[in-house]
Amino acid sequence: MIQIDQLRRLLGLFLVAALAPVAHAQDAQVTRMRAALAAPDRPAENKARDADRKPVETMQFLGIKTGNTVVDMIAAGGWFTEVLSAAVGPTGKVYAQNPPFLVQADAEKALLARLGNAEPVHVQLEAAGIVGKADVVVTALNLHDVYNGYGDQPGGESAAVAFLRSIYGALKPGGVLGVIDHVGVTGRDNKSLHRMLPQQARDAITKAGFTIEAESPLLAHSGDDHSKNVFDPAIRGKTDQFVIRARKPR
């Protein structure tokens, strides 16, 4: 008859054997990411942002895996596109979505050619045929503009919910939404500061149909008192940011 101690040892060995492939895959992904982010052809200005943006840790928190299909929603200059490209590896796919007015054609072409596993999207995800096919969609430092309104767009919670619903449609059942944005506080003019209340983001995310799984303090910055515009040289690149991971129901 197997004794309790023997059973515990056997169970421990089983768990080690079962988890070893997962740990190996995670180690390989981290090694690949660090190599890609340190590559000599990566722009120095992008590398300089890594210390504050913690790309490897952020990708791990969002649960992005090798081989995933991911969307960088409103990719702008493509810093996150490059990070996502490294995270999913050569067997994965990155869609760098930008509205036409944000497209920097020459820079985008050079970036995507260098990455090899990414392609541009200059229309809404549904129009591009990205429906129910993404494992993860990340929107970084954009939701505040949708919520606060920009250009001739009125903004408000309804605008944010509609934006997030378009992401919901792009995701597979069980897919992940990652939202990163500048923290705003009550009593400030968050529109002019390019910020939003974390609770505004939470409310819009849940009303769009997602379940919030976790939030991370990875990008919190205590030196930001939330009173300055995020483009103020005193805090640019070092703003206090919230990171939310949410999931589309299976």
Task: Specify the residue positions occupied by each region the protein language model found.
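Class I SAM-dependent methyltransferase Rossmann-like catalytic core
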Residues: Q29-K65
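Conserved beta-strand signature within the Rossmann-like core of class I S-adenosyl-L-methionine
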Residues: L164, G174-V183
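A short acidic, Gly/Pro-enriched loop at the edge of an enzyme's catalytic core
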Residues: N68, L115, A128-L141
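A short SAM/SAH-binding and catalytic strip from SAM-dependent methyltransferases
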Residues: A134-A160
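Conserved class I S-adenosyl-L-methionine
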Residues: T66-A76
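A short glycine-rich, Lys/Arg-flanked "PGG" loop and its adjoining helix->strand segment in the class I
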Residues: S85-A86, P154-P173
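S-adenosyl-L-methionine
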Residues: V103-V131
